[in-house]
Swiss-Prot record:
It is found in: Endoplasmic reticulum lumen. PANTHER family: DNAJ HOMOLOG SUBFAMILY C MEMBER 10. Residues 35-100 form the J domain. A motif (Prevents secretion from ER) lies at residues 790-793. This is DnaJ homolog subfamily C member 10. Residues 235-350 are annotated as: Trxb 1.
């Protein structure tokens, strides 16, 4: 017999069932939401190269093409592919680190390549230690470091790129130490390749700071590549003889530079001319390279006790004719790389600064200083000995300090492990610690950027909590790749905003208490302190966008609305006023992503559309009254009419500044004139006004996107130049006569009063501000011509 439940019991039991279901469902979700780093088997500190290598290994193992009998293969591969797509992208990685997968709702991915792609096309040079795969954020710093770079721009799907790969690897091994060999994957870094003018693959370019890039056009053999590279290597080999020997040696020794000399005699082997040239390039600025023909310089060779062919390194101050009692290094190898490594290993270490003189030395010069504890770990990398030479022209001295000799000094600088830092000539007050790669080109780029920027390392003693001047503080962790990528941009921004804002960085792995005090929950978190006001930066990691953010703080482009001001400014707006309003909530991630784009859009619409935002967390009742049901809700309030209160809601997929701007401008009344063949002839070709014309076709997508921009241009030049539009679908003959071959085409028709006729110029940009600037420049030229003609009369 069944048991009847009363209504209250039924509702109570139903709630329990639903609660149990939700608990089980959430447990399943948590169980399946695997950490992206764990999926790929990498740490949170993994570099882009390590992430690519880990993904490739898994892709070859788990790809559905290799597991046709596994029904879960597709789903399993999608998970690791998703993890890779997110972690390889700097912006997505930052979102994931900060918000988890919820922060990636607008970036769902879901596509992957065939197994053959991952086996043969993916990460072509990731396993080659002599070849450095460069990414956009590090490219400029690398090629401007002062070293010579030869870079291969390739595409994974390009057959010629794969044909070149074995030769490029052999070439890289051949010239290792002579110059840097790089590679750029244009499939991953399309923007970088476009910026560098790369439009075919493979494209090979030589880069050196201070000179224009040089493209290689020869055949792709190793010998031809070596020959081309050697043309750009700075190498001078001196033939030594009785007439120049003493002066050459003494001059070099006085400058602290030694000599590598190969003596060529009848017996034994001396270095070939090609090997000597390569060594000269590899040791440029560190050691002079020379050779001596003992057949013609017999007495000189005998005085040096040289009786057979040999090669020797003479350090500064060596006694040349007494090889038993000094540090002359005789070399048995004939291989350039082996000789290079042995010579550079024997070069003296950097100057060791003492605790007593440290403050004074740092106060009078700019220094790159290595901190070590007892043994100098940097001596294991002989390449770093090039730093002194490569930083000489930047007036940066290079030294080291042993923290075990004065622990208090390092503790006060918050140096607790081997590190390097730049000191900017003001003692220990102004310095910046390096958090990048411990390799030559990265250290060079850091040193040059840091001494010329205004970023300082912060600690409790100099944290600007109550400073009267505004500060931008970057809270970061050294293990976080997006944090490291942001640091060079902060240095650039500090130069752009010098005198307006101070810049500092705070390492949250060292100063955990300070970071907790300011509730720092993700890295990097960038905050502007302006006395009692604190503003968190949410934009992209670029100097330009940081500059925009600061400018917006000083001169806000978006009106922060309250229910009262919304009623006064928006609801009761003047007849000819229009508004765009963002209804948002601070906890909403898409709202946070939108905010910098919203501000950027507002700056471009100044004087045309009023832009505001209202916090629906603070004014929840008001937003409910306005029927705001989701965040962010973007509304356009058109000019007031006799109609009831109305607005347009934005339903577009893209919430970037450009898309929102185009959408808003589309509601404004047309200012330009629609022209027919008759009016085009009468007003433009036979009239006496300047005209800018948009030739378009209604079916053309780019034309539709450009239409609001052209209306913005029409408003900007109103009163100076008239703006018109010609429909080339309706009036094909008119457009044909005007020489129109693509849509949209913009032409400027300017009336020359002196000649009483029209001239025309095609404009090759679709940016309203740029077009307006070009037109203003042309009008100024016409005015100056008119003045000169009057003066001549």
């Amino acid at each position: 017999m069944g048991v009847w439940l009363n209504k209250d019991d039924y509702i109570r039991d139903l709630k329990r069932i639903i609660l149990c279901f939700l608990i089980v469902y959430m447990a399943i979700l948590v169980g399946t939401d695997q950490d992206f780093y764990s999926l790929l088997g990498v740490s949170k500190t993994a570099s882009s190269r390590e992430i690519r290598q880990a993904f490739k290994k898994l892709a070859l193992k788990l790809h559905p093409d290799k597991n046709p009998n596994n029904p879960n293969a597709h789903g399993d591969f999608l998970k690791i592919n998703r993890a890779y797509e997110v972690l390889k992208d700097e912006d997505l990685r930052k979102k994931y680190d900060k918000y988890g997968e919820k922060g990636l709702e607008d970036n769902q991915g879901g596509q992957y390549e065939s197994w053959n792609y991952y086996r043969y096309d993916f990460g072509i040079y990731d396993d080659d230690p002599e070849i450095i795969t460069l990414e956009r954020r590090e490219f400029d710093a690398a090629v401007n470091s002062g070293e010579l770079w030869f870079v291969n721009f390739y595409s994974p799907g390009c057959s010629h790129c794969h044909d070149l790969a074995p030769t490029w690897r052999d070439f890289a091994k051949e010239v290792d130490g002579l110059l840097r060999i790089g590679a750029v994957n244009c499939g991953d870094d399309r923007m970088l390749c476009r910026m560098k003018g790369v439009n075919s693959y493979p494209s090979l370019f030589i880069f050196r700071s201070g000179m224009a890039p040089v493209k290689y056009h020869g055949d792709r053999s190793k010998e031809s590549l070596v020959s081309f590279a050697m043309q750009h290597v700075r190498s001078t080999v001196t033939e030594l003889w009785t007439g120049n020997f003493v002066n050459s040696i003494q001059t070099a020794f006085a400058a602290g530079i030694g000599w590598l000399i190969t003596f060529c005699s009848k017996g034994g082997d001396c270095l070939t001319s090609q090997t000597r040239l390569r060594l000269s390039g590899m040791l440029d600025g560190l050691v002079n390279v020379g050779w001596m023909d003992c057949a013609t310089q017999d007495n000189l060779c005998k005085s040096l006790d040289i009786t057979t062919s040999t090669t020797a390194y003479f350090p500064p101050g060596a006694t040349l004719n007494n090889k038993e009692k000094n540090s002359i290094l005789f070399l048995n190898s004939l291989d350039a790389k082996e000789i290079y490594l042995e010579v550079i290993h024997n070069l003296p270490d950097f100057e060791l600064l003492s605790a007593n003189t440290l403050e004074d030395r740092l106060a009078h010069h700019r220094w790159l200083l290595f901190f070590h504890f007892g043994k100098n770990e940097n001596s294991n990398d002989p390449e770093l000995k090039k730093l002194k030479t490569l930083l000489k022209n930047d007036h940066i001295q290079v030294g080291r300090f042993d923290c075990s000799s004065a622990p208090d000094i390092c503790s006060n600088l918050y140096v607790f492990q081997p590190s390097l830092a730049v000191f900017k000539g003001q003692g220990t007050k102004e310095y910046e610690i390096h958090h990048g790669k411990k390799i030559l080109y990265d250290i060079l780029a850091f040193a040059k950027e840091s001494v010329n920027s205004h970023v300082t390392t912060l600690g409790p003693q100099n944290f600007p909590a109550n400073d009267k001047e505004p500060w931008l503080v970057d809270f970061f962790a050294p293990w976080c790749p997006p944090c490291r990528a942001l640091l060079p941009e902060l240095r650039r921004a500090s130069n752009l905003l010098y005198g307006q804002l101070k810049f500092g960085t705070l390492d949250c792995t060292v100063h955990e208490g300070l970071c907790n005090m300011y509730n720092i929950q993700a890295y990097p978190t960038t905050v502007v302190f302006n006395q009692s006001n604190i503003h968190e930066y949410e934009g992209h990691h670029s100097a330009e966008q940081i500059l925009e953010f600061i400018e917006d703080l000083m001169n806000p482009s978006v009106v922060s609305l309250t229910p009262t001001t919304f009623n006064e400014l928006v609801t009761q707006r003047k007849h000819n006023e229009v508004w765009m309003v963002d209804f948002y909530s601070p906890w909403c991630h898409p709202c946070q992503v939108l905010m910098p784009e919203w501000k950027r859009m507002a700056r471009t619409l100044t004087g045309l559309i009023n832009v505001g935002s209202i916090d629906c967390q603070q004014y929840h009742s008001f937003c409910a009254q306005e029927n705001v049901q989701r965040y962010p809700e973007i509304r356009f309030f058109p000019p007031k009419s006799n109609k009831a209160y109305h607005y347009h809601s934005y339903n577009g997929w893209n919430r970037d500044a450009y898309s929102l701007r185009i959408w808003g401008l589309g509601f404004l009344p047309q200012v330009s004139t629609d022209l027919t063949p008759q009016t085009f002839s009468e007003k433009v070709l036979q009239g006496k006004n300047h005209w800018v014309i948009d030739f378009y076709a209604p079916w053309c997508g780019p034309c539709q996107n450009f239409a609001p921009e052209f209306e913005l241009l029409a408003r900007m030049i109103k009163g100076k130049v008239k703006a018109g539009k010609v429909d080339c679908q309706a009036y094909a003959q008119t457009c044909q006569k005007a020489g129109i071959r693509a849509y949209p085409t913009v032409k400027f028709y300017f009336y020359e009063r002196a000649k009483r006729n029209f001239q025309e110029e095609q404009i090759n940009t679709r940016d309203a501000k740029a077009i307006a600037a070009l037109i203003s420049e042309k009008l100024e030229t016409l005015r100056n011509q008119g003045k000169r003609n009057k003066d001549e009369l």
